Amino acid sequence: MHPEVSEPQADGATEPSLEESAGDHGRAGPGVRKEEINETKETCVGPSTTSCQSQKQQSGDSRLDCRSGYARNDRDDRGPRMTKEFLQKLCKQHKLYITPALNDTLYLHFKGFDRIENLEEYTGLRCLWLECNGIQRIENLQAQSELRCLFLQVNLLHKIENLEPLQKLDALNLSNNYIKTIENLSCLPVLNTLQMAHNRLETVADIQHLRECLRLCVLDLSHNMLSDPEILSVLESMPCLRVLNLMGNPVTKHIPNYRRTVTVRLKQLTYLDDRPVFPKDRACAEAWARGGYAAEKEERLQWESREHKKITDSLEALAMIKRRAEERKKARDKGETPLPDSEESSSTSPEAQDKPPLGETQQKIEVFVEESFKVKDELFPEKPGGEEELAVVEDRTMEEPDLPGSLAQSQTLLVATAEESTSSVAATDGTGTEDTEAIALETKERLFIDDLPDLEDVDGMDMSMEDQTKEMGIPKIQVISSLSDDSDPELNDSPLPMLEHTPTGSTGVLSNIFAVCKDSSKAVRVPLTDICEPRATTELETQGQVFSTTPPRPLIQELEEDGRGENESKPSLPAQSSEDGDSQLPEATLLGDRAENEAQSSLDLGKPSPRASLEDIEFGLD
């Protein structure tokens, strides 16, 4: 360390000695000075690094050489490479598949690569971006047999090579490189687009290989150094060429009437340089080739006249439509029927035009109806047990008319009361108790078809069914007796004669019922009136709605008339009321509060026994 610090002082000390020696030997010539300076330079050169660094600072040439050597070593050692790890990280960055074979696109542009390598695992690539790198050679693409697009623009390529594995390549971009000759492209059978702009193409021989590219449709040769007009012969031999770009080449100035000539010679061309080749341009160019500028001018005038005629025809058609619309509007304002257009009437009459649509609509309607019936048959096929279903449906239809007339009351009534009401109405029409039992059995069979026993058990169940009907008939007859006395005023006068004419089998039951009523008439009268008043009203309504024997208004009038008759005959009833309390029960149940008031008045007029009055007080004030 100490010698390194002392070295600058020694150098500083030696400098004045050199100057003094030079001053002392001032008389000596310049040759002596040069020799001394050279000797000092030679003494500085040595194995030590410090002497080498001082030498680099003194000589600029040696400094540049040293820097260039370091730069080459850095580029060889530290330059970006297409390693597998780098490619995997890149796939993660671009949200691609980590499995290499699953990726169809790989973005490797603007990375500074100088070689194409480590792409063997990426066998499913369809598009490979390698633009803006330092690639000097096309190589290592043997595994990319499915590649369609290869972008190698803005690189350091000098030659087209190693493209044989890319049999499905469709687009190749080699712009902005240093390629001097188009070659090795005939091995690409489906190549459609080739971009060779900004390269070093000069002569016809440089593009002669394009004759072998039979499927090439898009060719970009702009901004090269092509100057020979004979390149058109090469371009003519390309049967599928549609798009051509020769801008920026000297040949565009060397070919007279460049656009017309190229358009005429390339028959399939649709786009030249910066704009398309329209049919009008092609027709004018062909006319120019036939007869010069005069023929071209005439052809152009014809095209312009045709275009003008198309425009005028369209405007006239619009004006005609507007005029016809105004005429129709005027006719409608005047109340006249607008006449059809003359053109339409001459070609086809409106009736003939309207008939086919009407026929078609009718056919469509018929087809729709048939299809709807077929769908109905498929969805609702006829079943073997149709009779049973019909019975149930008839039963429901008989029950449905009761609903709209008595919605408020049907919410409080049960299904059993409805069935009993139907049976009671049938009994009050003048039929016997046997008929009522038969009707009850029929309704039960209709409503409970699913509950019927099997055919094997029918014989053993006959007696039990008869017993059940007898047992079930008893509460129905009780309800009939209670409701018929309350509901039907016409039957109030003669319930017992009907019972006398009944068969002997049922007289016992009915006599027992009425015997109970006679024994406990005073005790049961008030509860029956409270219970049977709403049922009596419902029975009257159901009788008027179901059987429609008498309309509601005449029925009310008859009730009022009966009430008036009873009021007129009330003075003769008090004696009977004291003797028999059953006669007061139908009056109270039929007329409600009004009947109760009349019964009370009759009781006051008749002056019944004290025992009867006490019982009335006990049971009447609940």
UniProtKB/Swiss-Prot annotation:
Q: Where is the composition biased (Low complexity)?
A: 48-59, 337-351
Q: Where in the cell is it found?
A: Cell projection, Cilium
Give all Phosphoserine modified positions: 349, 464, 487
- Molecular function as annotated in GO: dynein complex binding
Q: Which InterPro entries match?
A: Cilia_flagella_integrity, Leu-rich_rpt, LRR_dom_sf
* Feature: compositional bias, Polar residues: 540-550
First-listed, main subcellular location of the protein, grouped into a coarse class: other
Question: Region (Disordered) spans which residues?
Answer: 1-80, 326-360, 481-503, 540-622
UniProt feature, compositional bias: Basic and acidic residues: 22-42, 62-80, 326-336
- Protein's job: Cilium-specific protein required for the stability of the ciliary architecture. Plays a role in cytoplasmic preassembly of dynein arms. Involved in regulation of microtubule-based cilia and actin-based brush border microvilli.
What is the designated name of this protein? Dynein axonemal assembly factor 1
